Amino acid sequence: MGRSELREHIFRILFRIEFQPKEEMEEQLALYLEELESAKDTEKEYIRTKYAAIAEKVEMIDEKINASVTGWKTSRMGKVDLTILRLAVYEVEWDEEVPQGVAINEAVELAKRYGGEESPSFINGVLGKIVNSR
């Protein structure tokens, strides 16, 4: 499984945060990983570890997103866009294995696949502001 596919699985799990109580997310993660029958144990562990790292920093990530958008708050954003931003901001700010350009490009690709018509440009703009403010 390539990094893009792993990232997409992390996105799908992170998306559940918006709809599940926090205390149920560990069970949700286990159920999701159980369904990935073709995934290797190392891939499942990568997904689990990265999800946990992002979930731990969600509040800090949301603060960075809120500071980068004018007239928007994470509470008003579409859930798909917010989830993509959370994943990408984590990669830009804390994941040294992922180059910034790759994180942004992958986020835009996820937005094209799962978001609305304006999602790719919105995601690109927010991430650009975050990267430029570093």
Language-model segments: residues:
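N-terminal interaction/assembly modules
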Residues: M1-P120, N124-R134
